[in-house]
Curated annotation (Swiss-Prot):
Glycosylation sites (chain numbering): N325, N343, N387, N427
Naturally occurring in which organism (per UniProt): Caenorhabditis elegans
PANTHER family from the UniProt entry: GUANYLYL CYCLASE, RECEPTOR-TYPE GUANYLATE CYCLASE GCY-6
Location(s) in or outside the cell: Cell membrane
Protein name: Receptor-type guanylate cyclase gcy-6
Lineage of the species this protein comes from: Eukaryota, Metazoa, Ecdysozoa, Nematoda, Chromadorea
Amino acid sequence: MIGVYLRSVIFPLLFVIQTICQPPGNVFHLGFLHCDVLENNVEGSTTYINYRTSASAASIAIDKIKREGLLLGYDFKFTILYDQCDENIAAGNAIKLFAEHNVDVLFGPTTNNAAMPVFILATYYNIPLITWGITSSATLDDESRFPTAGMLSIGSRSLAVTFREVMKEYGWDQFVFAYSLEMNDEKCETLRDDFQNMVAYYGDIVLSYAVQIMDHSEEGLLAILKDVSTRGRIIVPCFHEGNSRGLHRRWMLVAARNGFVNDEYVYIFPSLRSRGYAVPQADGTFRYPWTEATGPQPGDQEALLGFQKSIFIVDMQGQGNVGSNYTQFEHEIIQRMKEPPYNCTDACASPEYQTAATYAGQLHDSVYIYGVVMDQIMKTVPNQYKNGTAFPRKMAGVFNGVGGTVAIDEGGGLQPTLFVLTLDSNNNSSLIMTVDVDQQEAVVTKHYTNEATALWSHRKGIRPPDQPICGYTGSLCPANVFFQYIGWFIAAIIIIFFTIMGAILAFIYLCHAKQQEVERQNALWQIPFKSMMTVTKKGKGEHSMRSISSVPSTISSTRSSTLSEVGETRNYLFFQIQNDVEMERVAAKKHSIRMVFDNKTCATMRQMRLIDHANLNKFIGMSLDAPQLYSVWRFCSRGSLADVIRKASMQMDGFFIYSLMKDIINGLTWIHESSHEFHGMLTSKNCLLNDRWQLKITDFGLRIFRTHDQYNKSDRLWTSPELLRTDDILGSREGDIYSFGIISAELITRSSVFDLENRKEDAEEIIYMLKKGGLQSPRPSLEHDESIEINPALLHLVRDCWTERPSERPDIKQVASQLRSMNTNRNDNLMDHVFNVLESYASTLEDEVAERMKELVEEKKKSDVLLYRMLPRQVADKLKLGQTVEPETFDIVTLFFSDVVSFTTLAGKCTPLQVVNLLNGLYTIFDGIIEQHDVYKVETIGDGYFVASGVPRRNGNEHTRNIASMSINFVKSLADFSIPHLPGEKIKIRVGFHCGSVVAGVVGLTMPRYCLFGDAVNTASRMESNSKPGQIHLSEEANQMLMRLGGFTTEPRGEVIIKGKGVMATYWLLKMDESAAPKILKKKQD
């Protein structure tokens, strides 16, 4: 009853799925022929092509077509019928689809039996047909007979071509073929015919024997093995791949138990429905072919010995084993079968329907490719959309299928990639080669470096021949001559022994030398952090070189002024390292990853350091012991291209822009043609300029760090839309071309990327619009200054580089060729061009420089005059030369202090401005007097006046004479001094001086002062504070100095209590003889 209900209600033979009602002219009618195991229990269809585990792949493909903006304005209508893998049902339902439902295209059938009549009918109705699944017959691949058919399934002819490539690769010329026609499966018969056709077509290998297996018991298989063993050693068994897959195990078990598994025999299993050594189960899991589905059995290990001598040729790509998104695709198929329009819930709930069909990906790719091709047809020749004869030729190309790249030839047939597998030494499936098949031709890609270990690990590393060494009867081996020539054999063995020993020793020496060379090269790129000298700048935190506690500068004597101006950035630090000749300036890029450098990574570092290209920045090495991981690159003094554009410090003409673009292309050409393949993160920030205006690309090759580095949103503005959508941080060649276009726009417009400063959108909004794509996808403006001559072809080239579709962008060779064609009859040397530009400004600049120099000299004179008034000349001269002014001790000097008597009372009678004018007039008189003496005015504080002699210029014992003479002149000068606003008031001063030792030095960075320190300063100040108005008070030491000099009259004051000193004997200076006047008068400090 359940079966009747399912047949009559849930799965009628015909139902129509119409997605969205659209006008008839805008709806494509898609027809499908599926095989449903409930109606006809076709063995294997559950695993490979069952409707319940594959049909929704078409809807997923339609979603992808719409996401990619294909066939805009069109909808799709589905009509699904079941052929039940039967040719009669298939023919009848095909006529219904073509004649009654008037479908525009037919997808299916999925088996060889059902396909033949449908192919004929599609040709008759001239309707496009795309088949998928397990249709493998080479007959269906006849373009002349079936011109309307495109095939995404792999034909057995591709297996035959791949098999021939395996035979040729390992030097085998002959093989035997044993096949079974169990379950009436045409697979092996078709394969036999294709093998025979392949042998006849090429003529370079021989099918020695072909035999059909009639008896599948162990006895029958043993008889076949004995038969074929007399005809060949390369044995190709072929069995049905449905529920009878146990024949593979039974065959190998019989071979192992009866002596047909040894180093002579090779068993090659060609299969399109197999995954090699992974046998799929109904629940989606896998088992090994040497085991039973029911679990471990006796004989599993014996069967394993047989499979160790085997090779599988399989279609892994067609079954979705290539591509990281395939697991999600399989899960989505099962989920969407439960949703409208399929609504397969109860009927699809069984465990065997919880895993997607093996070839569901082919159905998805068939519908998707139809959408891509039809989009092109509707844009070019819309009246040909239903022309079946023309359709297969339009399918030619490469498409991004759900399981990986799908290549279609000119006839609409799949260009498959077949996988050749064997068991490695650990009995794990190992891919040894892939074969890309195109019609009768093939391209072989080996996936091993050592054939002995990769293929023959179970054969002692020896490749087996295709026939016994001595022939099948042993007649090919000569008689044993060992004993006849035993002496020669012994001599040969000795020679060989010593030769081998010599070779071993030479090999050991070479290995040791190679290891030493590797270690030497590793030492070159491993840069110790302690050898990297940081370049510092003088700042607020540094001690003054002019203070009394000055110490030698901490600034490196080898620092570069250019480096010191750069400083640390978010991504870079700047250092100097010692190379073979001199200190070299470097930039260290910060990486936020810590990792162990294995041999492969070390080899990459060695290769990176050997790169020396005119337009690639030199990679110096890595600093592994730094606080964080640094990659070290040569420093380019002019900074990045982005910096040059932002600062607008260089006037760029058309040739200058062209030269920089050419440098970028030269660097990218090398990268694209090298093992690095592409840059991946090309921006104007990592296009650097050296002092010769030569552009060098940096930050290339170290892709291992890029996935862990931190990037701002603005750093992604140069990334192509397709990479932004996938969050691919590594990049591609096409992405580099896009980035080059964006950088070129910056150069042409001399503005930042996307002119962010003048746009209303920020970086994140622009990236969102780039990801979204479409007709409104933003691109930089190419409007440039009309004074700059830009070749219009250059603007077209830039627009081609940033086109939305990667496939439509020119490759690096095309870009380089077009750039060369734009620079005819011009010198390619940018430096010569820059020099020519500079020469045109030379005369004007010389005059301007001379004028500026004259102004500079005048300003310097004024500055020197001001400086000499603030500091002693000899001190100022040292500071101007950048020399350190060390604190200095003076054993004997004379120190003078004075202040105005009752200054506070006097100031109270004046306004602040009058006080300033009063002191300015008084000090102007005093300054004129000190100019006549060998003294130095230390400072004035309010009404206090501090003068010293004997410092900083030593003058023997004349310092006391100069201070005494100056003091007397100070007192005398006040007799004629009057206060303009207080004519009745008279100024009187108190004077005191003392002789003693002091320490002198420069203090401070801002307004530095030449200061004196010591007890003598305090004593001199006390002489002044204890003096009387109009009197000159001096200490006993000063009095003794005057008495030794002579010419001065003093009188004792007596003992006076001095604060901080106790009782001191002091004196008054009364007068000075003219003969005692200082000999050094009106002398400037020198």
